[in-house]
A protein has these predicted regions:
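C-terminal helical cap(s) of enzyme catalytic domains, especially alpha/beta-barrels
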Residues: 351-369, 374
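Flexible, acidic/Gly-rich N-terminal and inter-domain linker regions that tether
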Residues: 1-89, 388-389, 393, 416, ...
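Active-site pocket-lining/capping segments in soluble small-molecule metabolic enzymes
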Residues: 257-261, 272-275, 279, 335-358, ...
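Core AdoMet radical
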Residues: 109-126, 130-232, 239-248, 270-277, ...
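Generic structural signal for well-ordered alpha-helices
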Residues: 90, 128, 156-163, 187, ...
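Conserved C-terminal portion of the radical SAM core fold
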Residues: 143, 197, 202, 223-287, ...
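Canonical Radical SAM [4Fe-4S] cluster-binding loop centered on the CxxxCxxC motif
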Residues: 82-83, 87-123
Length: 474
């Protein structure tokens, strides 16, 4: 048995089973302790975050008026750090070849129904051109773990190909990467290739469940997987994204583990996760979510999002098209700052829509709207869709990004960049009605930029964008 130690780089010490069990017991015991709950809410108002134990008490709290306070605070913190901007991205699936046996994923090695496919570089060009023609500027690369079919060299070559494609006014300006846990040296190579964020979901922090859910393949190794973010940061990757797949294990256990992981990264590297993702298990080929006993309802999902936002105020929060329009709308105000749109979870699914019998998707999409429909929907709700990738390209990553975010100074960069990239989208890709709504929104939102000098520069740049110039940024 290992002691709990957030400073340790041993998985079973920084994600300590006994500490999680004690945290759950503490929260259960104090979920009606109003003086304690009030003190935690007051601490959260300082915008400096909460410990996993404190956040767990808020998650377990079932006093309606206190929950309303938690939701209101989450909304205010989201507004303070991220304003009304919502960053847009799309996943790009390169290959579904996989040697692992994950029981919740249709890519598992024993699945003989799914059509296996790996994109050639020529096919990647077609996929990325289709994504650029939608208006996307930011991608998340996804691939199964297979050292023969999907070696690191294939991923690196694919990144180079993606960055090289410039179709009409299109460009992919940030490539985030979601691939299996690897070595420090390979993370260094990914860094040198110019990736943005390295994303890896823990799936579950419960070691025994993890090993049962990953019975075969290299992913079976709990410690190697859980310590991946440490190796990534040692390899020079400044921005990492963590997450769990809600539904595999008790959500309370996962919530505590997720926050302990964030605390560990902050403790060891001085910077916590750049993003936290909150996917829920979904139907897919060979996978029935009802076979998993720990699914969570929409109310619980919303509470988790709110409590993560309150506990880790600086982190970006992501929900994908796994979630329905209704679910996404609810959590946008509670903490989510980044969503996917117009997504395909099939290999090669952007250039050519896939026939049902050729299914190569990782999961069924719940929000099937086009990117333009989602952009219009966001603006109708009062949000500013952002295609910005400036921080990564200006070197505002890792601790530099976090210091700006925590101080609130990031607002002088983010809103101007959001408005300028939205203007690009409206001119190059938007439907007429979307463009009309967006132009009015930009004129209103410019007034919210804190510094008048920056307002003036943005207005000049918007004129330049009208003339055909692109890629202005602060």
């Amino acid at each position: 048995m290992y002691p709990y130690n957030p400073h340790s780089q041993r998985a079973e010490e920084f994600i300590n089973h006994e500490e999680i069990l004690e945290t759950l017991a503490y929260a259960e015991e104090n979920k009606h302790n109003i003086p304690l709950i009030d003190s935690i809410i007051e601490k959260a108002k300082l915008r400096k975050g909460l410990s996993h134990r404190e956040a767990m008490v808020l998650l377990d709290c079932d006093i309606p008026e206190k929950n309303e306070e938690i939701y209101a605070l989450a909304k205010q913190i989201k507004q303070d750090f991220y304003g009304n901007r919502i960053v847009m991205f799309a996943p790009l699936y390169l290959s579904n070849y996989c040697v692992n046996g994950c029981v919740y994923c249709p890519y598992h090695a024993k699945n003989k129904h799914i059509r296996r496919k790996k994109l050639t570089q020529e096919e990647i060009v077609r996929e990325v051109t289709a994504l650029q023609d939608m208006g996307h500027k930011r991608l998340a690369l996804e691939t199964g773990e297979d050292p023969v079919n999907n070696p690191i060299e294939y991923v690196l070559e694919s990144i180079q190909t993606i960055y090289s494609i410039k179709h009409k006014n299109g460009a992919i300006r940030r490539v985030n990467v979601n691939i299996a846990a690897t070595t420090v040296e390979n993370y260094r190579r990914l860094k040198d290739a110019g990736i943005g964020t390295y994303i890896l979901f823990q799936e579950t922090y419960h070691k025994e469940s993890y090993e049962r859910l990953h019975p075969t393949g290299p992913k079976h190794d709990y410690a190697y997987h859980t310590e991946a973010m440490d190796r990534a940061m040692e390899g020079g990757i400044d921005d990492v994204g963590i997450g769990v797949l809600f539904g595999l294990e008790l959500y309370r256990y996962e919530f505590a583990g997720l926050l302990m992981h964030a605390e560990h990264l902050e403790s060891v590297f001085g910077v916590g996760p750049h993003t936290i993702s909150v996917p829920r298990i979904r139907h897919a080929d060979d996978i029935d979510p009802s076979a998993f006993d720990n699914g969570i309802d929409d109310d619980t999902f919303a509470k988790i999002v709110a409590c993560i936002r309150v506990a880790v105020p600086y982190t970006g929060m992501i929900v994908s098209t796994r979630e329905s329009q209704e679910s996404r709308e609810r959590v946008l105000s509670l903490g989510v700052s980044q969503i996917s749109g117009g997504s395909s979870t099939s290999v090669g699914g952007y250039y050519e829509k896939e026939a049902e019998e050729d299914n190569s998707a990782q999961f069924d999409v719940s929000d099937n709207r086009t990117l333009d429909e989602i952009v219009k929907w966001l603006m109708d709700l009062g949000y500013v869709p952002s295609f910005c990738t400036a921080c990564y390209r200006e070197g505002r990553t890792g601790d530099r990004f976090m210091s700006l975010c925590k101080s609130g100074q990031i607002q002088n960069c983010c809103l101007p960049n959001a408005l300028m990239t939205l203007k690009e989208y409206l001119i190059d890709y938007a439907a007429p009605k979307t463009k009309e709504i967006g132009e009015k929104l930009i004129l209103e939102e410019i007034k919210s930029i804190p510094k008048e000098k920056i307002q003036e520069i943005v207005r000049k740049n918007l004129v330049e964008i009208e003339k055909g110039n692109r890629d202005f940024r602060f």
